[in-house]
């Protein structure tokens, strides 16, 4: 324990993209609870999994025999989010929509901040122990983990910082 079940949703009638859902059961006598949700961007290729009576095996954060352990991969991806092309792990990961959209939004905000003499800072930090791993049919791992991000923006003197995206507008 804990045990995890991974599920992929269908595209909805209103064309909402597929989601990867992770349900976790912390002990034998507890119900499964939704633990994680990840939006599957267009073009995502999922690995194959064992479809049998027993299903795919659970992986661990310290699985070996891979390019890096799942925990190390999460730490490396957080470093890549933090440092972009300057990350020492940049060559280990293919380009992806999340980083592309984040880079575009960051550049857009930076341009506005420079015009009004503001500042911005982003940090990305993996959460220790917040990881679920499922073994794929080819011996790899599908890793879902929590990486907290904090984006601090300050407007120049006498100015106000506005939400930078539709998601931020919904929160404010």
What residue spans do the PLM features occupy?
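Generic alpha-helical propensity signal that fires on short helical segments
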Residues: 50-55, 159-165
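Surface-exposed, charged secondary-structure patches
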Residues: 1-19, 118-164
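C-terminal structured domain segments
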Residues: 164-172
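Short beta-strand edge/turn micro-motifs at domain boundaries
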Residues: 14-76, 140-142, 172
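Residue-identity detector for glutamine
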Residues: 15-16, 25, 30, 58, ...
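Core segments of small alpha/beta cavity-forming domains
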Residues: 1, 48-121
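Detector for Asparagine
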Residues: 31, 83-86, 116, 128, ...
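Generic signature of intrinsically disordered, low-complexity segments enriched in small/polar residues
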Residues: 9, 35-38, 52, 80, ...
């Amino acid at each position: 324990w804990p045990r995890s079940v991974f599920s992929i949703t269908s595209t909805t009638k209103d064309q909402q993209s597929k989601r990867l859902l992770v349900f976790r059961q912390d002990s034998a006598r507890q119900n499964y609870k939704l633990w994680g949700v990840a939006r599957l961007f267009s073009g995502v290729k999922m690995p194959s999994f064992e479809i049998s009576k027993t299903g795919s095996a659970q992986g661990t954060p310290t699985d070996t025999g891979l390019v890096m352990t799942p925990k190390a991969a999460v730490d490396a991806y957080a470093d890549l989010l933090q440092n972009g092309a300057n990350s020492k792990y940049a060559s280990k990961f293919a380009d992806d929509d999340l980083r592309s959209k984040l880079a575009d939004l960051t550049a857009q905000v930076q341009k506005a901040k420079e015009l009004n003499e503001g500042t911005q800072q982003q940090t990305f930090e993996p959460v220790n122990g917040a990881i679920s791993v499922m073994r794929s049919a080819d011996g790899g791992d599908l890793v879902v983990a929590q990486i907290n991000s904090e984006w601090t923006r300050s407007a120049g003197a006498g100015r106000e910082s506005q939400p930078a995206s539709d998601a931020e507008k919904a929160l404010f």
